[in-house]
Amino acid sequence: MPVAPIDFRNVEKRFGDKLVVNGLSFTVQAGECYGLLGPNGAGKTTTLKMLLGLTHPDAGTISLCGEPVPSRARHARQRVGVVPQFDNLDPDFTVRENLLVFGRYFGMSAQAAHALVKPLLEFAKLENKADAKVGELSGGMKRRLTLARALVNDPDVLVLDEPTTGLDPQARHLMWERLRSLLARGKTILITTHFMEEAERLCDRLCVIEEGRKIAEGAPHALIESEIGCDVIEIYGPDPATLRDELSAFAKHTEISGETLFCYVSDPEPLRARLKGRTGLRYLHRPANLEDVFLRLTGREMQD
């Protein structure tokens, strides 16, 4: 049986008295996109740092590309491309030079590094920016350049930490399209995100993390079906607790978050009829999504 590119087994990490990763286990299979989904502070970035050997676990075992981590992390990283949460491009270099210099870090000859530049610029849709300084690029261009740089060594595995944070919707969608093209080429991707839409669009499977613990795992559609399994009506108005007392008979389940009442309904029509014509209330009827899964599992909405 082939060795999984990424394997976490009962991993723990403490910083002082705080347990930030708590018995975390997951396996990423070759060619899939696996997501770590959770709010800021859930332990996602610490998990990636341990995977790459940059932070040592206090318990458990980790393997990356078949190599034990941290003891063989340096060797494993030769087969990995990394897109960090914050761009660390060299501002003194042009777009082209950022790629060339990174190629030399992997021991490439100048000729080999130069041969990579054109296809990587085309992949990142930056052909017209080859000689521009990093400071001249938009946020989306910088993220695509960081992704292109992560591909210099033709990695088997890509590790991306919040790859579209801070991007506008158009730039985010272009980044997703580029990542899907990499999956089509057989790359294995591990991604952390707190964007529900990103997780639903990209991930074959995902792990929902809260306070360093895995609280759910599976394909996005399977999690939505198993945890919710029906439509949702969001009701916005004053005093959601009183609203819940009035409307709970029309729903399978209800949740309150802030000023919003979430009603999970198999048949939405009786509740919609009840709400029709009510002044001071607004409501939205929609299919269930991963935000509902997170709310159901944790009792709160995802926070940035």
Swiss-Prot record:
Residues that hold ATP according to the record: 38-45
Entry keyword Transport: yes
A Pfam family: ABC_tran
Cellular location(s): Cell inner membrane
Segments forming domain ABC transporter: 6-236
Keywords in alphabetical order: ATP-binding, Cell inner membrane, Cell membrane, Membrane, Nodulation, Nucleotide-binding, Translocase, Transport
Enzyme Commission (EC) number: 7.6.2.-
One GO CC term on file: plasma membrane
InterPro entries to which the protein is assigned, alphabetical: AAA+_ATPase (IPR003593), ABC_transporter-like_ATP-bd (IPR003439), ABC_transporter-like_CS (IPR017871), ABC_transporter_ATP-binding (IPR050763), ABC_transptNodI (IPR005978), P-loop_NTPase (IPR027417)
SS bonds (residue pairs): none
Domain of life: Bacteria
A GO term, aspect molecular function: ATP binding
Nucleotide-binding keyword on record: yes
Membrane topology (UniProt): Peripheral membrane protein
Quaternary structure and partners: The complex is composed of two ATP-binding proteins (NodI) and two transmembrane proteins (NodJ).
Function per UniProt: Part of the ABC transporter complex NodIJ involved in the export of the nodulation factors (Nod factors), the bacterial signal molecules that induce symbiosis and subsequent nodulation induction. Nod factors are LCO (lipo-chitin oligosaccharide), a modified beta-1,4-linked N-acetylglucosamine oligosaccharide. This subunit is responsible for energy coupling to the transport system.
Family indicated by similarity: Belongs to the ABC transporter superfamily. Lipooligosaccharide exporter (TC 3.A.1.102) family.
Protein name: Nod factor export ATP-binding protein I
Species, as recorded: Burkholderia lata (strain ATCC 17760 / DSM 23089 / LMG 22485 / NCIMB 9086 / R18194 / 383)
